[in-house]
Amino acid sequence: MAALGSPARTLRGLLRELRYLNAATGRPYRDTAAYRYLVKAFRAHRVTSEKLCRAQHELHFQAATYLCLLSSIRQHVALHQEFHGKGERSVEESAGLVGLQLPRQPGGKGWEP
C-alpha cells in the first residue's frame, strides 16, 4: 500500500464509499451506524498540538486499508457486471464473435453429395 496521506482525506474517501453503498437504498448515508462510528472514531483520535499518538496512526492505517478494500470491491463488481459471461454460447454465436460464419448445406435438409 502507498503512503497514507492525511486522515481527513482517508475519512472523506470512506464517506464517499458509504455514499456509493447507500445509493441503492435511497437513504442518506449520514443516517447509518457506520457513518456515526467513523466520525466518532476520527474525532476521538484527532491529534492536538504536537502530541503524537500511536492509536491515531493505527486508526488511520486501518481506515486506509478498509477504504482500499471498499473501493476494490466496488471496482470488482463494476468490472464483473461489464465483462461477465453470458453462459454457454451456441456454435453460431461463438463463430460470429471471431468474425466467421458456419458453412451452409447447399441442398438443405437431406442433401447428400
UniProtKB/Swiss-Prot annotation:
Transmembrane segments: none annotated. The keyword Flavoprotein does not apply. The keyword Transmembrane does not apply. One of its GO terms (biological process) is response to toxic substance. It holds the Pfam family Complex1_LYR_2. CDD domains: Complex1_LYR_FMC1 (cd20271). This is Protein FMC1 homolog. The lineage of its organism: Eukaryota, Metazoa, Chordata, Craniata, Vertebrata. PANTHER family: PROTEIN FMC1 HOMOLOG. Keywords: Mitochondrion. Residues 90-113 are annotated as: Disordered. It is found in: Mitochondrion.
